[in-house]
């Protein structure tokens, strides 16, 4: 089996961190009991998906972005761990109140986007756009790293 260093040759530290955490999670999954029944295979698929998202959130800096905090919090909650939520109260600014008077089409699109981006529920539109751009960048990084892993590990 090829090493991760040979599979992912990059100068982007986020990719390296993602690859490290993702490969470590996959290794831990592999050490668990084999999954033979369809229910167990579905469980394994969910675990791999969760490992990919948690690795991506860690690579993004963990607590530096709202979406990464939301993903990590959701993962902790799924593991039945105690989750501490921020006690900070969010104020609705006058900008947000004014933004509610915008065209309904824009508001509907922003609301759909809030539902797609983890942790996007209470964000103002400008912050939502910033978080969405970073989230998309990290998702594309995740896809590229996973494609490198598949290309490097598949028989030629």
UniProtKB/Swiss-Prot annotation:
Disruption phenotype: No visible phenotype. InterPro entries: bHLH_AtIBH1-like, HLH_DNA-bd_sf, IBH1-like. The keyword GTP-binding does not apply. GO terms for molecular function: DNA-binding transcription factor activity; protein dimerization activity; transcription cis-regulatory region binding. It comes from the Eukaryota. One of its GO terms (biological process) is gibberellic acid mediated signaling pathway. Residues 90-139 form the bHLH domain. Highly expressed in roots and at lower levels in rosette leaves, stems and cauline leaves. It is found in: Nucleus. The keyword Transmembrane does not apply. GO terms for cellular component: nucleus. Keywords: Brassinosteroid signaling pathway, Gibberellin signaling pathway, Growth regulation, Nucleus, Transcription, Transcription regulation. Induction: Repressed by epibrassinolide. Belongs to the bHLH protein family. Interacts with PRE1, PRE3, PRE4, PRE5, HBI1, BHLH49, BHLH63, BHLH74, BHLH76 and BHLH77. Plants over-expressing IBH1 are dwarf with round-shaped, dark-green leaves, short petioles, siliques and roots, and are insensitive to brassinosteroid. Plants silencing IBH1 exhibit increased length of hypocotyls and leaves. Atypical and probable non DNA-binding bHLH transcription factor that acts as a transcriptional repressor that negatively regulates cell and organ elongation in response to gibberellin (GA) and brassinosteroid (BR) signaling. Is able to form heterodimer with BHLH49, thus inhibiting DNA binding of BHLH49, which is a transcriptional activator that regulates the expression of a subset of genes involved in cell expansion by binding to the G-box motif. This is Transcription factor IBH1. The gene is IBH1.
